[in-house]
Structures are given as structure tokens and as C-alpha cells.
From Swiss-Prot:
Its EC number is 2.3.1.181. The record marks 134 as: Lowers pKa of active site Cys. This is Octanoyltransferase. It comes from the Bacteria. It catalyses: octanoyl-[ACP] + L-lysyl-[protein] = N(6)-octanoyl-L-lysyl-[protein] + holo-[ACP] + H(+). It is found in: Cytoplasm. In the reaction, the free carboxyl group of octanoic acid is attached via an amide linkage to the epsilon-amino group of a specific lysine residue of lipoyl domains of lipoate-dependent enzymes. GO terms for cellular component: cytoplasm. The active site is at 168 (acyl-thioester intermediate).
Amino acid sequence: MTVALGFRDLGLIDYETAWHAMQRFTDGRGREAADEVWLVQHPPVFTQGQSGKAEHLLLPGNIPVVQVDRGGQVTYHGPGQLVAYLMLDVRRLGFGVRDLVTRIENTLIALLADYGVKAAAKADAPGVYVDGAKIASLGLRIRNGCSFHGLALNVDMDLEPFRRINPCGYAGLAMTQLSDQAGQIEFSEVSARLRAQLVKHLDYAEQATLTGGINHYD
């Protein structure tokens, strides 16, 4: 069991700032570098993964579209969505890609169960769903045995922009969020519960709070 998983709470941050910092963190880390999770929210943005197709961007309007290097297709990020970027040395952890995805999905399913929400994964469509509606998305990149990008959980946000795309490449895919399933919730509490579940499901002994920003990576 790895000793500690470090968490850096960055608040509301521009998507491209976080993305480029993730790339530099991953490219510059040594074999002994500690793993980190960055917890963020983003201003409104669509991101198009490596499998993305232009026809799945229906009416983006004034929301910017960023082509990125993660797996998957198009998704939306906005305030009220909890995004966790997972910078993990998966070789050191001994995880295969499928195993890592399953562990992340199980993390989210357990978190939602804490709020009395019954969720499930789908074998052919990564992410987590409640009664067929998607509540959390996954998108990862593995480089030199290390992961970056991560998960996005809809907590309490404006879901309208999802109707401007085919989320994750699926036309008409319904989206939902935790506040619609569990009523009034505290975003900070959801974040704290996510931290605990990630530590458990990724086999770390404990969590650590990291201070400082990521400006030295951008």
C-alpha cells in the first residue's frame, strides 16, 4: 500500500492553465515523485478528446472549445462541477488502465452511495450513471507510465450546456447531478468525501493536503 496521496485544492481555474500544468508535471516527474490529485472547478468550456468528432459539437455558442490529449470525446466543464485530475504513477501502483478506470468508477459509486444515490458503471461507456443518466465522466491519458486528466462529477451546476453537444459522443444522452438526486449539498463536503474515497479505492494509506498553486508548472 502506497503511503499517502496528496491533494491540491485549486478552486476555480482556467482549463488550459490546468491542462498545461498537468502535462508539465507529468513530463517532469521522476521515478520517486509523489502522486498528486488536483481538485478544481472550471469556467465554462467544452473539451474535445482524442476520439472526438466535430459533429458531436452541436451548438457550442460562446463557450470555448479546447482540443485536448485525453481519451474520449466531447464533454463540458463548468462551475459547480467537481473535477479531479489524477497524476498517478500507475506503474508504481501496479494498475493497468482498465483497473484504474474501474477503481475511479467505484470511487464515484461509493461517494454517491454516501448520499443515498444508487449509481452504476457501464461496460461500454466509461463513467457513472444514475438510472441511465450520466452523473460523472472519465477521461485519462497515460504517458511514461503515469496518468493525468481524470474525472468530473456533476455536483450542483447548470446542465444546459450539455444539450449543446452529444456528451461523450452519445446523441441525446441525459445528464444529471448530485443536487438533483440528493437535494441540498455542500460542495466542500462532496470534495472531502471524494478525497476519502479516492484514498480508499486507489490503495493509499492516507491523504495529505498540499499547499501552494501550480504556477511553477504552467
